[in-house]
């Protein structure tokens, strides 16, 4: 397991402060799409999305991940120009917020270049580096890149057979890292993602997450994107917007396995969960004078009269 969640070089590149091991960097999600599977925010305008980002930052987010194409498989891919028009105004505005570190969720090199020019510091690739030029775009823009495991193309729902899904994830990501390095990305700028749900059945995803420790053999920080995923729904028999408790359980397991970044919808719940968990485990010191503010002690009943 890594001594630091992120190396000082990557912390400096992204402008992030050091975090203790019990509290990974939290990546809040802002969808610049009309069709996200789990977006209940009603965030349709640039202003709406900036306000959501502001709230996520106030709730404890370290990074804001902006995406212009949803992962819904029964919808066509978004044209490059349309995706750029969705994400660039949002990224430009969020990047101006105090303390905001912006990531762009895209697999298209042209979108990545436009997003980096607009202020994104991370390229979050969910295609498994389908196009090596995406890594070149990150290198040119001095941005970090997240490389995710998947054996399916974007927008494709596919569950290929695996002889050993854990070994496949490790080998795939090792190859993706080497390809990124060949495009000029410094090793210190690479983050890996096991890709829960992507080209994996719920059982296969669970198998990979149980073995998350093995990904430390790659020598790179791990991003866990388990928020509201189908494997959580399969275990709990709940729809996307009802999976927060299951998401927090997955987050806890990820922290135990040494993840560096957690990509989440509900940042406030995750931050509170991690704080209480660390206090009870002894990882977070608790002042003897700790007390609850009186106005937060109970719900005030408001008369209907």
Give the residues covered by each predicted segment.
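A short, charged/proline- and glycine-enriched loop
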Residues: 23-25
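Catalytic domains of carbohydrate-active enzymes, especially glycoside hydrolases
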Residues: 51-67, 257
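Phosphate/pyrophosphate-binding loops at sites that engage ATP/ADP/AMP, CoA/4′-phosphopantetheine
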Residues: 57-58, 176-189
């Amino acid at each position: 397991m890594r001594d630091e969640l992120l190396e000082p070089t990557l912390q400096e590149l992204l402008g992030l402060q050091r975090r203790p091991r019990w509290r990974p960097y939290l990546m809040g999600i802002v969808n610049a799409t009309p069709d996200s599977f789990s977006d209940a925010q009603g965030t349709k305008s640039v202003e709406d999305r900036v306000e959501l980002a502001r709230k996520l930052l106030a709730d404890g987010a370290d990074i804001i991940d902006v995406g212009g194409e949803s992962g819904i498989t029964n919808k066509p891919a978004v044209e490059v120009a349309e995706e750029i028009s969705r994400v660039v105004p949002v990224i430009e505005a969020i990047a101006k917020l105090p303390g905001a570190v912006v990531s762009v969720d895209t697999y298209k090199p042209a979108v990545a270049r436009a997003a980096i020019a607009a202020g994104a510091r991370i390229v979050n690739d969910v295609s498994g580096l389908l196009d090596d030029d995406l890594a070149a775009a990150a290198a040119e823009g001095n941005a970090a890149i997240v490389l995710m495991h998947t054996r399916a193309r974007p927008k494709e729902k596919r569950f290929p057979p695996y002889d050993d899904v854990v070994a496949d994830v490790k080998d795939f990501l090792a190859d993706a890292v080497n390809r990124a390095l060949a495009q000029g990305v410094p090793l210190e700028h690479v983050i890996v993602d096991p890709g829960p749900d992507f080209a994996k059945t719920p059982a296969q995803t669970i198998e990979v997450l149980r073995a998350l420790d093995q990904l430390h053999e790659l020598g790179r920080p791990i991003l866990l994107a388990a928020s509201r995923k189908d494997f959580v729904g399969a275990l709990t028999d709940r729809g996307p917007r009802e999976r927060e408790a299951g998401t927090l359980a997955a987050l806890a397991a990820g922290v135990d396995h040494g993840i560096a970044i957690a990509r989440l919808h509900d940042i406030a719940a995750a931050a509170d969960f991690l704080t209480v968990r660390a206090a009870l485990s002894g990882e977070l010191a608790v002042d003897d004078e700790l007390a609850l503010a009186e106005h937060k002690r109970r719900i005030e009943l408001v008369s209907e009269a």
